[in-house]
Amino acid sequence: MSQNHTILQNLPVGQKVGIAFSGGLDTSAALLWMKLKGALPYAYTANLGQPDEDDYNAIPKKAMEYGAENARLIDCRAQLAHEGIAAIQCGAFHVSTGGIAYFNTTPLGRAVTGTMLVSAMKEDDVNIWGDGSTYKGNDIERFYRYGLLTNPALKIYKPWLDQQFIDELGGRHEMSEFLIANGFNYKMSVEKAYSTDSNMLGATHEAKDLEFLNSGIKIVKPIMGVAFWDENVEVSPEEVSVRFEEGVPVALNGKEYADPVELFLEANRIGGRHGLGMSDQIENRIIEAKSRGIYEAPGMALFHIAYERLVTGIHNEDTIEQYRINGLRLGRLLYQGRWFDSQALMLRETAQRWVAKAVTGEVTLELRRGNDYSILNTESPNLTYQPERLSMEKVEGAAFTPLDRIGQLTMRNLDITDTRAKLGIYSQSGLLSLGEGSVLPQLGNKK
């Protein structure tokens, strides 16, 4: 194997090392360890509007206590909202089960974090970056790509790829004892039956007990909504309206939001009251191994439902088909950490220009429990849905007449004749059996 000089396998002593600092056990122990071993750690914390984070301002202070040369809090929420809306506009969601999608909320968060934190590091002349991603996951590749896109001179140092760090602090217990031994009164939190990663757009629950498919969604405690499967949790039906202007969500229940962050937070509150957007997915990681996750995304789900309702009422069939096909392709690129690659930008621009621009209107829904909802009304000045065209009643100025339909059907004789000839060829070659007892018995009936 050729040596990758971009990835440093040993601690760069005496050099500035940026670390994506969450304030949790792993990054706290890593920061202190790097400091004691002679590196110059700089801490960067992304404010992504995580629903399970109470006090962002306390995180950089904690980093300084653990020995950071400097610690910065980077507000990434506006950019995250922007990318979330772009994903909605493009339908960039390729993982789904039974029609319920995973809204790629973690990949969107990584695209924002990976670019904005490395950009902040460049301002501080920090060109070595570390984060908490493991070698078996997706994030190690996502951060690698986004980091190098932002700073081509970037070097990567991850304590979790450094054998010395692993030998000395290989587990949560060792990390906790290390902090205590160095004078920090660190109380290790009780481990959950799964791990959680979240941002303003959604939450991911995975690993540990959730690696076993006989552990279902019921072991998860939602952080963005309610446990809708629990009959003891009261969930009342609720009507909600969502308004789009040129593909951008701008209003909820008639109230306009100039700040997309506030819009998302309110959408999360509305959808969360019902457990909307929760899903259980088996997916293929970038390395092709399968993993399983339980996901929450109440606001993304609400916007997606309303947006697609308008798309189907405004655009023609071929446009909708291309929107869906391109959305699947773009969703996979986003998942792989290629959200800013040229092939992804091409697909994004196509959807945002030719699909989203026409999506203006308002959709009213009734939300119930989980992903159970009904669409109550759809309004748009751009609707091509015109029921009078297909009315079963006698109408003046009809779009077409019975005679027109006869002509249209007669034209179909051309391809019907061609199709019948093809079926005969397949029969003669043994690919298709015609006649009595076959899948197409009527075609072989010469009586």
From Swiss-Prot:
Task: Supply the enzyme class, top level.
Answer: ligase
Q: From the UniProt record, list the reaction(s) this protein catalyses.
A: L-citrulline + L-aspartate + ATP = 2-(N(omega)-L-arginino)succinate + AMP + diphosphate + H(+)
Where it sits in the cell: the answer is: Cytoplasm
A single cellular component GO annotation: cytoplasm
Q: In which pathway does it act?
A: Amino-acid biosynthesis; L-arginine biosynthesis; L-arginine from L-ornithine and carbamoyl phosphate: step 2/3
Indicate yes or no for the key word Cell division: no
Q: What is its main location?
A: cytoplasm
Where on this chain does L-aspartate bind? 134, 138-139
Query: What EC number(s) are associated with this protein in UniProt?
Result: 6.3.4.5
Q: Which domain of life is it from?
A: Bacteria
Instruction: Name the UniProt key words of this record, in alphabetical order.
Output: Amino-acid biosynthesis, Arginine biosynthesis, ATP-binding, Cytoplasm, Ligase, Nucleotide-binding
The UniProt annotation places ATP binding at 20-28, 46, 132, 134, 139, 197
User: Pfam families per the record?
Assistant: Arginosuc_syn_C (PF20979), Arginosuc_synth (PF00764)
* Biological process terms in GO annotation: argininosuccinate metabolic process; L-arginine biosynthetic process; urea cycle
* Residues engaged in binding L-citrulline: 102, 138, 142, 195, 204, 206, 283
Signal sequence: where? none
TM ranges are none
Gene Ontology MF terms: argininosuccinate synthase activity; ATP binding; protein homodimerization activity
What the entry lists under HAMAP family is as follows:
Arg_succ_synth_type2 (MF_00581)
Could you say which protein family the record assigns here? Belongs to the argininosuccinate synthase family. Type 2 subfamily.
The record's note on quaternary structure and interaction partners says: Homotetramer.
| Protein name according to UniProt | Argininosuccinate synthase
The source organism is Neisseria meningitidis serogroup C / serotype 2a (strain ATCC 700532 / DSM 15464 / FAM18)
